Amino acid sequence: MHTPIKAITLLILILGARQGLAQHYLEVRGADTKYRYFDWNYTFANSALVDMFYVGVPGSNEFNLGGGYGFKPKPCLTLAPLVYAVIGKEAEQRGIKIALLVMLEKEGWKVNSFLGHFERISGDVDDYQVLDTLDVSRVVHGPFEVGFSSGFFRAGGKWNPQNGPLFKLNDRLGAWYVSWRFGPDNELRFSRNFLFK
């Protein structure tokens, strides 16, 4: 096992050993492009977090295990730098992903963004950058939100941007999302998340 992956594993074990009030977050996504995503993260009372997610598209199945810390420069804003060990099923992919999670809620507006950079350690998968996703929404009535969803995947100097409308329905367990994004590959995406305190 490479030294960076050992360091990330140790960080996750240390963070996982802390005691305190916790918050679990689960999310499942799917799309007509055969995109699939499963995420579980655990945030401690001290804002340290552990995150594990799987993302798959045709020809790629990637597992990410990492963690980080959430900073709140303002009560409405959370910035969470994250580091992941990345293992891909195909092409003997191994690497590190450095990411930034941004969450903002203010006066009915909500912004959520995950921006990441994958750095290859071994295997045949090139370095890449990903925005998955940038969602901007506004509460319009009760549990309903409308907004805009944007994302991209950049590898080998080639971009695959997607942009389009977003609709969201909140309930006591989390939220349902649907977005219709346009770009080189149009995508109808569905998502469900759960938040447990």
Positions of predicted regions on the chain:
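Extended, low-complexity, charged alpha-helical tracts
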Residues: 84-88
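Acidic (E/D-rich), amphipathic helical modules within compact regulatory domains
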Residues: 69, 83
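Outer-membrane beta-barrel transmembrane domain signature
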Residues: 32-49, 58-63, 70-78, 89-197
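Short strand-turn segments of transmembrane beta-barrel domains in outer membranes
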Residues: 26-31
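Cleavable N-terminal export/targeting peptides
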Residues: 1-25
